[in-house]
Amino acid sequence: MSLHFLYYCSEPTLDVKIAFCQGFDKHVDVSSVVKHYNMSKSKVDNQFYSVEVGDSTFTVLKRYQNLKPIGSGAQGIVCAAYDAVLDRNVAIKKLSRPFQNQTHAKRAYRELVLMKCVNHKNIISLLNVFTPQKTLEEFQDVYLVMELMDANLCQVIQMELDHERMSYLLYQMLCGIKHLHSAGIIHRDLKPSNIVVKSDCTLKILDFGLARTAGTSFMMTPYVVTRYYRAPEVILGMGYKENVDIWSVGCIMGEMVRHKILFPGRDYIDQWNKVIEQLGTPCPEFMKKLQPTVRNYVENRPKYAGLTFPKLFPDSLFPADSEHNKLKASQARDLLSKMLVIDPAKRISVDDALQHPYINVWYDPAEVEAPPPQIYDKQLDEREHTIEEWKELIYKEVMNSEEKTKNGVVKGQPSPSGAAVNSSESLPPSSSVNDISSMSTDQTLASDTDSSLEASAGPLGCCR
C-alpha cells in the first residue's frame, strides 16, 4: 500500500483512515455491544453512575461520558470516553478481577505503581485512578484513565511504511524503553498490541502488568512476553537484563519489513527451532551459559548455519531509499542484525541503538535523556503478600492518587495540552467516538504470559 508522505513539524504522519480502518487484534464488537449499552437507573452515589458494557458493568465518575467499548483482554476491558472536566477523549481500563488470586493482585499493583512513576512522551500517561467503592472492605474495582490513541501497531505493520515512518516509530519505541531502563524497569511484554500510535505518528508504550525492576534476587520468570517476541535467554530459562526488550523491538521491526511474524513458534521448542533455523545455531561459548539439562537438549538439536541478513531481509522487502533523511535499506538491515542477536551479551544496547544511523536522524536530547522515573517502592518485585494484603496496598495507592489528583490529572503527569490527544480534537459530549479505531490492552493468554510460572527448572524442562 502506497501512502503519500507528509511532514508535520518535520515528523512523519500516518493516514489514519487508511491505516486504522480495521479493528485491533483482540477486539470487542462495538455494534453488538452498543445494542445492550444502557445506563443504570440506580446511581451508586451522586459522583458515579453505572453503564452496562457487554458482560461487564462500568461504574464511573459522572465526568466520563459516552462510554464505548474498544478492547478487551485477560486483564481488563477498555472503553473510550469523553472527559467533561478536561474536555478531551480518554481511555478507561477496568482491571478484570484484580483480586482473583495473588498473581492478578501483584500484576495490578505493579501496573499501578509503575504507571504512576513514569512520565515520558513515548509512554502512555495515567490521567486518573479511581474506585467507586468507599471502604477497603467493599473495594473490588480499579479503573485506570489514560490517554486515548488511534490504533495499535498491529494495523501499522500491515502498511507499506517508508523509511521515515519506520525509523521514527522505532526511535520513539527506543526512547520509551530507554526511559524505563534508566530506572531499572524492564517492560518484558513488548509486542505490537502493546504499542499505540496516533495519525501524526506519535507512539506510546502500554501495559506494565508484566514489567519489573531489574536486579531482583528472585528467579526471573520465562512466561512474560507473547511467545513470538520472546528473547532466546527467556526461552532457554537464563537470567535476563534490559536488552531482553531490544530483542522484542527487533522482532517488531522485522515484522514491519516482512509484514508477518518472524518467529511464529507453536511452543517453546518450536519457537527455539524457528529462531535457529533463521539465525543459526549459537556458538559453544553461548552454550556454556545454559543450564546443563537445557544445554544437553540444545546441543543435540540439528545444527543450522542460518541465513545472512541480506537473505532474511532482501532489498525487495524495503521501501525505496529516502532522499530526505538519507535512510537506506542497508542501514535498516544493519540495525536488525544488531538487535536480533541470540547471545544477549553481544546484542546492541538501547543507547547504541539510539545512536545507530537508521535512528539518530531523529535524536533529541530532551526525548532521549529525559529524567528517569523515581520508583518509590524499591521492593516492588520482591514483595510477596496474601490477596488481602495486596488488596490493601492497591487500595492505599488508589486513595493516595485520588487525594493527589487536581483537575482530574494525577500530579506529575503531562497536562492535557501536552498529551497525545489535543483538546481541539476532543469530541463534545453529544458526539460519537466510534471513529477512534483502537487502543489495545490486549493481554496475552495466561498460557503465554503467566508470570506465576517460575523458571525454577528452565522453560525447556519438558525436553529432559
Curated annotation (Swiss-Prot):
* Catalyses which reaction(s): L-seryl-[protein] + ATP = O-phospho-L-seryl-[protein] + ADP + H(+); L-threonyl-[protein] + ATP = O-phospho-L-threonyl-[protein] + ADP + H(+)
Is rRNA processing set as a keyword in this record? Answer: no
Give the Gene Ontology MF terms in alphabetical order: ATP binding; JUN kinase activity; protein serine kinase activity
The short motif TXY is annotated over 221-223
Q: PTM Phosphothreonine: at which residues?
A: T221
Q: Which residues carry this modification: Phosphotyrosine?
A: Y223
Topology with regard to the membrane?
Answer: Lipid-anchor
Instruction: Return the Low complexity bias intervals.
Output: 423-432
| Polar residues bias spans | 433-454
Q: Name one GO cellular component term.
A: postsynaptic density
Q: Which GO terms describe its biological process?
A: cellular hyperosmotic response; JNK cascade; locomotor rhythm; negative regulation of transcription by RNA polymerase II; neurotransmitter receptor transport to postsynaptic membrane; regulation of circadian rhythm; response to light stimulus; vesicle-mediated transport in synapse
**Cofactor(s) the protein needs:** Mg(2+)
Q: Which residues bind ATP?
A: I70, G71, S72, G73, A74, Q75, G76, I77, V78, K93
EC number annotated for this UniProt entry: 2.7.11.24
Active site at D189 (proton acceptor)
S-palmitoyl cysteine lipid attachment residues: C462, C463
Which residue ranges does the record annotate as region Disordered? 405-464
Q: How is its activity regulated?
A: Activated by threonine and tyrosine phosphorylation by two dual specificity kinases, MAP2K4 and MAP2K7. MAP2K7 phosphorylates MAPK10 on Thr-221 causing a conformational change and a large increase in Vmax for the enzyme. MAP2K4 then phosphorylates Tyr-223 resulting in a further increase in Vmax. Inhibited by dual specificity phosphatases, such as DUSP1. Inhibited by HDAC9.
Q: Where in the cell is it found?
A: Cytoplasm; Membrane; Nucleus; Mitochondrion
According to its UniProt entry, the function of this protein is described as: Serine/threonine-protein kinase involved in various processes such as neuronal proliferation, differentiation, migration and programmed cell death. Extracellular stimuli such as pro-inflammatory cytokines or physical stress stimulate the stress-activated protein kinase/c-Jun N-terminal kinase (SAP/JNK) signaling pathway. In this cascade, two dual specificity kinases MAP2K4/MKK4 and MAP2K7/MKK7 phosphorylate and activate MAPK10/JNK3.
Similarity comment: family membership: Belongs to the protein kinase superfamily. CMGC Ser/Thr protein kinase family. MAP kinase subfamily.
PANTHER family reported for this sequence: MITOGEN-ACTIVATED PROTEIN KINASE (PTHR24055)
Q: How does it assemble?
A: Interacts with MAPK8IP1/JIP-1 and MAPK8IP3/JIP-3/JSAP1. Interacts with SPAG9/MAPK8IP4/JIP4. Interacts with HDAC9 and MAPKBP1. Interacts with ARRB2; the interaction enhances MAPK10 activation by MAP3K5. Interacts with SARM1. Interacts with JUND; interaction is inhibited in the presence of MEN1.
| Domain free text | The TXY motif contains the threonine and tyrosine residues whose phosphorylation activates the MAP kinases.
Q: What is this protein called?
A: Mitogen-activated protein kinase 10
Species assigned in the record: Rattus norvegicus
